[in-house]
Amino acid sequence: MPPSPAPLRSKRVARAAVALLAVVAAGCAVTPAKEFEHSTFEGFDVVSYVPDQPRGLVYLFHGSNGSAAFAERVESTDVLNRLIGQGYGFVSTSSTERTGDRRWEVGSSSTTANPDLARLARLHTHLVNTTAVAASTPVVGIGMSNGARFVTLWGQVWKNAGYPVKAIWASMGRIAGPGAAPGALTVPTVFSTAVNDFTVPPGPIVTNFVDTQEAGTPTELYFSQERDLRPVPYLRIPGIDRSEADQIVDALVATGVWNAAGERIVRDIQQAAAQAVTAQFPPSVAGQLGAISDETALQMAVHQFTAEHVGKVQAFFDRYVPR
């Protein structure tokens, strides 16, 4: 029998803490290690980087209300930097749905009827024809929330179609409906969730992990833990200095969610999250409010993409992508 979710979590807490310290300890702004290319394909934005001899190609899928620019958010950039350093290229584009929730289509596994799957196949052909990506270049996928559901659909459909899909990372999301039956997902998969996520609660993700593991598909499950409010994570945001990071923390403490020691004192996590958004930040950081919100959500361990697991994800990918 697989281990229960509680032991899984407890066994990983210490390792997660070490990895997290490695991510944030330096307090340095996260910027692209290589220049990202901005282009369009069939009218949709594309952000990408392809080295001369790519070891593999990462497809990055945003969550609801997202776009190709997901690649340029602090945590995404940190993840991509790590993988680029290991020889990968990446591509990030936007979902076909550009109104409403701007989500990926996760209800259909048809490579023709599903507009996202169809366009991504054409985009891949374009990359093979115009960059150093070859038809045989190993492919991995990373998705957040709705993008996590989509990466499970895309990964399995592409694997079934003969594409060299080697592994995927589903962050803060469940397996998409067409592949949700136990044993249907055969692509090696990392699942990750956060202990306080009330948008996509951990329970169903844990169930997906257990079902995938019992079916014999290589899989791992990572949890993000809540941590005390500190200024260091905000130093990861380009343009924010230590004085501003301290002011950000002061503004968040002033909402009443945390005490002066950075400990959350509003017990209900949904109330705490709603209260935190009322913070009045200094005018000098007005252009970075989205990134501030992201880093705050990470400390609260709610629904947010995180780079804290990138070392483990890279090691997982390494098992299936040759050097």
Language-model features: where?
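Cap/lid segment of the alpha/beta-hydrolase catalytic domain
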Residues: 92-115
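The feature captures the conserved acid-bearing segment of alpha/beta-hydrolase catalytic domains
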Residues: 166-249
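Alpha/beta-hydrolase active-site loop
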Residues: 107-131
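Primarily recognizes the serine-hydrolase "nucleophile elbow" in alpha/beta-hydrolase
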Residues: 136-186
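Short amphipathic alpha-helix adjacent to the substrate-entry channel of hydrolases
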Residues: 72-88
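N-terminal cap/lid segment of alpha/beta-hydrolase-fold proteins
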Residues: 31-50
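Short beta-strand element of the alpha/beta-hydrolase
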Residues: 55-63
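C-terminal catalytic histidine-bearing segment of alpha/beta-hydrolase fold enzymes
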Residues: 217-323
